[in-house]
From Swiss-Prot:
It comes from the Bacteria. It is found in: Cell membrane. The keyword Hydrolase does not apply. The chain crosses the membrane at residues 96-116, 153-173, 205-225, 273-293. This is Uncharacterized protein MT2637. Keywords: Cell membrane, Membrane, Transmembrane, Transmembrane helix. Residues 1-75 are annotated as: Disordered.
Length: 325
């Protein structure tokens, strides 16, 4: 039995014939949709009834910025303690006098407050002198000092003055170091004009109170809270956040970057200890460097930025690079 002749075209085509490039689809059929994940060729339009294909998985519009004043877990901090030390030393060498003079002035002020308080307490206290003579005939005296109510009041006021001065110094040094991190020109006076001083005072009181309460709970909770709240004052100075929000932001920042926070804290402690070993004169260098490390760490871990360290210019007579024709 003979087979019927085949029609030209694709045997699988139920309509037969050649569906060339210029032909139209038969009635009842629309243009085939584009393959998944691809759009129409450039310069063409999609047929009616079809919308633009969705973007491939993993793509889409960029996410919006995080709320101001708070870090985000999805943001890479890019923090390195080596970079923090290098950047801080570079910035210190470029602003040495501007950084050292305020630290020296604050140290003199602290010594004056401590000395005045101690002197007044001793002067207002009752002293009793007792003389002793041993069996060998050698005489000696002992002085017993009993604090009076007036001396107690002076000591209390001295502690308040010392606490306020320490917070003022902390805020002033942070203000200057934050301006350095922003690339702004700074002077000695910059470190004596702290920003958001009221927020800083309340934030400091909150930290001291919560640390004291934690210290009553077997000491360790107080130490832990003091560590995780280390950036609270920086948030108050830099972003004008409320005391509670500053503490929350610091806890979140440290909690999401424990390793970097610990390494930075150790680097700051080392800078101060080395300064103490150099007969305390080295603290005029150690304290500013530690403050710069603190600011660098705060900015990087909280999603902020710092102006990169300026490299020294090449020496005079440096050969030029290759010239293009």
């Amino acid at each position: 039995m003979s087979q019927p002749p085949e029609h030209p075209g694709n045997p699988a085509d139920p309509q037969g014939g050649n569906q060339g490039a210029g032909s139209y689809p038969p009635p009842g059929y629309g243009a085939p949709p584009p393959p998944p994940g691809y759009g129409x060729p450039p310069g063409t339009y999609l047929p009616p009834g079809y919308n633009a294909p969705p973007p491939p998985p993993g793509y889409g519009p960029p996410p919006g910025p995080p709320p101001p004043g708070y870090p985000t877990h999805l943001q890479s901090s890019g923090f390195s303690v080596g970079d923090a030390i290098s950047w801080s030393w570079n910035r210190f060498t470029q602003n040495a006098v501007t950084l050292v003079v305020p630290v020296l002035a604050y140290a003199v002020a602290l010594a004056a407050v401590i000395g005045a308080t101690a002197g007044l307490v001793v002067a207002l206290s009752d002293r009793a002198t007792t003389a002793y003579t041993n069996t060998s005939g050698v005489s000696s005296e002992s002085v017993d000092i009993t604090m009076t109510p007036a001396a107690g009041i002076v000591m209390f006021l001295g502690y308040i003055a010392l606490f306020a001065l320490v917070l003022y110094m902390h805020a002033g040094i942070l203000t200057g170091c934050l301006d350095i991190a922003d690339g702004k020109p700074v002077t000695i006076a910059t470190f004596f004009r702290p920003r958001n001083l009221g927020l800083v005072l309340v934030t400091g009181l909150l930290i001291v109170a919560l640390t004291f309460i934690g210290g009553l709970l077997c000491v360790i909770p107080g130490l832990i809270f003091g560590f995780v709240a280390q950036f609270a004052v920086a948030f108050a100075v830099d972003r004008s956040t409320s005391p509670i929000d500053s503490v929350k932001a610091s806890i979140e920042t440290v909690g999401s970057n424990i390793g970097g926070s610990v390494l930075s804290w150790l680097a700051q402690l080392t800078a101060v200890l080395v300064g103490e070993l150099l007969c305390f004169v080295g603290m005029l260098i150690g304290i500013p460097v530690a403050a710069l490390i603190h600011v660098y760490t705060y900015r990087k871990l909280s999603g902020g930025q710092v102006v990169e360290a300026v490299r020294p210019a090449p020496p005079v007579g440096w050969p030029p690079g290759p010239q293009l024709a």
